[in-house]
Amino acid sequence: MAKKNQKSGSNTIALNKKAKFDYELHERFEAGLALTGWEVKSLRAGKGNITDCYVIFKNNEAWLQACQIQPLLSASTHFVTDPFRNRKLLLNRREINRLQEAVEQKGYTVVPIALYWKAHMVKCEIAIAKGKQLHDKRQTEKERDWEREKQRLFQRDQR
C-alpha cells in the first residue's frame, strides 16, 4: 500500500510570541475551534493573527475574543464577514471548569499561544498564564542573553 505524500513545512498557522514574553505560562490545553468555511480557507492561506487575543467565559463556554482572521478576496460575497468575531473553543467540561477556576484566582488569565493544523482540523493551544511585572521581563531578557553568550563561548571553545 502506498503512503500518502505529506506536505512539507510546518502545521503552525499563527504564534503568539508576545504571550511568552508578557506572561508566565503554566498549564497548557489543546482546544478545537468552531469556524465557518471562509475562516478555514483564510487560515489555509495564513491570514490568522492571535497576538492580542484572549479567552473569555460565557454561560460555561469558552470563547476566543479578538482573534483576527482576514477574509480572502475570493470568499463568498453574499454575506458579511467579520474578521474579529468571537469564536467558540471546543473543550471538555472538566477542562472548562479547570480554566474557570484558574481565572477566578487573582492575576490569572487564559491566553492562546498557537493556532495549528492537526489532521484536517484547526486547533488552538491555550495556557493558564499570570502577567509578568516589568522586572520579571527584564530578568527573562537577561537570562536569554546569558544563554546566547554561553552558546557563543561554547562554540568558540570547540574550535
Curated annotation (Swiss-Prot):
UniProt-annotated stretches for the region Disordered: 137-159
**Which terms does the UniProt entry file under GO BP?**
trans-translation
Give the molecular function GO annotations: RNA binding
Any Pfam family matching the protein? SmpB
Give the CC-aspect GO terms: cytosol
InterPro entries according to UniProt? SmpB (IPR023620), SsrA-bd_prot (IPR000037), SsrA-bd_prot_CS (IPR020081)
Per its UniProt record, what CDD domains does this chain match? SmpB
Query: Any idea which UniProt keywords this protein has?
Result: Cytoplasm, RNA-binding
Cellular compartment(s):
Cytoplasm
Explain the purpose of this protein.
Required for rescue of stalled ribosomes mediated by trans-translation. Binds to transfer-messenger RNA (tmRNA), required for stable association of tmRNA with ribosomes. tmRNA and SmpB together mimic tRNA shape, replacing the anticodon stem-loop with SmpB. tmRNA is encoded by the ssrA gene; the 2 termini fold to resemble tRNA(Ala) and it encodes a 'tag peptide', a short internal open reading frame. During trans-translation Ala-aminoacylated tmRNA acts like a tRNA, entering the A-site of stalled ribosomes, displacing the stalled mRNA.
State the family named in the UniProt similarity comment for this chain: Belongs to the SmpB family.
PANTHER family for this protein: SSRA-BINDING PROTEIN (PTHR30308:SF2), TMRNA-BINDING COMPONENT OF TRANS-TRANSLATION TAGGING COMPLEX (PTHR30308)
User: What is the official name of this protein in its record?
Assistant: SsrA-binding protein
Per the UniProt record, the lineage of the source organism begins with: Bacteria, Pseudomonadati, Pseudomonadota, Gammaproteobacteria, Cellvibrionales
Q: Which gene encodes it?
A: smpB
